[in-house]
């Protein structure tokens, strides 16, 4: 059985949780040994066997990001010819999965990591493209053969956002974790290198700078932390310049009244994230 997985993110280009999810899913499916798992990701060519990168169409250079995305989706759909099942992740790849399903008369499964109707602030990022991304998602969800929600709450949100979707087609499959990779591992050298004092208590945030993560709320609340507590932020990949500016301003204000505010704006290797989490 051939399964084609479509995703905007895939190593080495990962900036959020959906990319991590897809990476682990592909690894687990390929480990079975009885499936032909192919990955179609946005961006540059990949060296991994069975994985293809699909760059932006040069004809759409400078266009709204939503239109650029649709250009890549056409490439994804064409590449899925011959697949038995297509599985797409996030609105970026959903239209690729939908078109592949129509062209090949094959099942389309999609996993819901977020929902466009619940992220109206994305109009800051995409402008009119937000209406396009919302249309893409609605079209794909209503036509999909199955929709995977990563939580019961997400399932409720899907059915509320898209009431015409048959509830029987929406299944919950919770996100998992590789407990062998994410073992506690103290490494004070790594912690100190990033400016954290391992002898002081700390609270840590790991995630993208995006509205749904609620980082500005944390930064405002952090003013109430005991003075000996450090606030460690492993936060980058902002959705928009506006939220980046807001976070930068809040961090600057917080640092005026307390020390121990550590911000690492780059994405760290997993072993360093483990070390930072282990010190919190």
Stretches with model-predicted labels:
Residues 153, 176:
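Carbohydrate-associated surface elements
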């Amino acid at each position: 059985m051939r399964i084609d997985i479509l995703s905007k993110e895939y190593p080495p280009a990962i900036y959020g949780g959906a990319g991590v999810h897809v990476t682990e899913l592909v690894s687990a499916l390929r480990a079975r040994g009885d499936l032909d798992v192919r990955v179609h990701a946005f961006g540059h060519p990949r060296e991994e066997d069975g994985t293809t990168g699909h760059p932006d169409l040069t004809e759409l250079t400078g266009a709204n990001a939503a239109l650029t995305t649709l250009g890549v989706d056409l490439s994804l759909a064409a590449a899925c010819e011959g697949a038995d099942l297509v599985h797409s992740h996030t609105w970026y790849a959903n239209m690729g999965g939908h078109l592949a399903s129509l062209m090949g008369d094959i099942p389309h499964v999609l996993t819901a990591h977020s929902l466009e109707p619940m992220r109206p602030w994305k109009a800051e990022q995409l402008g009119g493209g937000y209406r396009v991304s919302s249309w893409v998602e609605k079209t794909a969800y209503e036509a999909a053969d199955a929709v995977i929600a990563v939580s019961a709450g997400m399932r409720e949100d899907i059915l509320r956002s898209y009431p015409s979707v048959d509830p029987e087609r929406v299944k919950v499959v919770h996100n998992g974790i590789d407990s062998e990779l994410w073992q506690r591992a103290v490494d004070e050298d790594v912690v100190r290198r990033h400016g954290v004092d391992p002898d002081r208590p700390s609270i840590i945030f790991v995630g993208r700078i995006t509205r749904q993560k609620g980082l500005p709320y944390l930064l405002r609340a952090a003013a109430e932390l005991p003075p000996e507590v450090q606030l460690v932020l492993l936060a980058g990949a902002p959705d928009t310049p506006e939220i980046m500016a807001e976070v930068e301003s809040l961090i600057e204000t917080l640092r005026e009244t307390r020390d121990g505010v550590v911000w690492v704006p780059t994405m760290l290797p997993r072993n360093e994230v483990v070390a930072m989490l282990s010190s919190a």
